[in-house]
Every structure is written in structure tokens, then in C-alpha cells.
């Protein structure tokens, strides 16, 4: 399996409000693996769309665009009126269209 490398940029993205304030701190600190662990536990018990969005944000930050796309979509499907969720999904879709290798990777899932 070959990993697709997308150009790395530093951007500031909004973090959704959560009932789990620790996860926001972890995301802001760049401790994405710990945040993923906590958010996966939280969403297994209650699939709050804000937590799903934040989980997608963590996956996007570590370069797992397939899981980011899946969790952003789950958040958006739970609340399609939320612009934040649509923006997360849109970022991954844009990357998919701009990078043919990434498109193949996402399509193979």
C-alpha cells in the first residue's frame, strides 16, 4: 500500500463545541492521536455531530483523508444545515479533485 502525500500547509480551522472540552485542548495542542482515541470513545457511545466533525478534523490533520471524509459525512448527514460540517466535507472533496492519487485512494475505500 502506498500513501499519498498532499502538500503540507498550516491552516487554522475551527474546532466544533463539544461536551468533551479535553478534546479541544488536545486538538489545539496537536495531540491528534489522543484526541482521536477520546473522540472515538465518545462517538461510540453517542454520535454527536460536533464530536464527529472534530474527529474528522483530527483525521484530516494526520493525513487520513478517507476517515476524515467518512466522519465529516456522518456529521453532515446528522445536521446538513451546519456550515462547519459542510466545509470539512468540502475540503476533502476539493483535495480529492485536485490530487488524482488521493482520488484513487479515496475511491478504493
Q: Each PLM stretch: what is its role?
A:
Residues 1-44, 48, 62, 74-77, ...:
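C-terminal/domain-edge helix-coil "capping" segments
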Residues 51-52, 85:
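TPR alpha-solenoid repeat register
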Residues 58-85:
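Charge-rich, low-complexity intrinsically disordered segments
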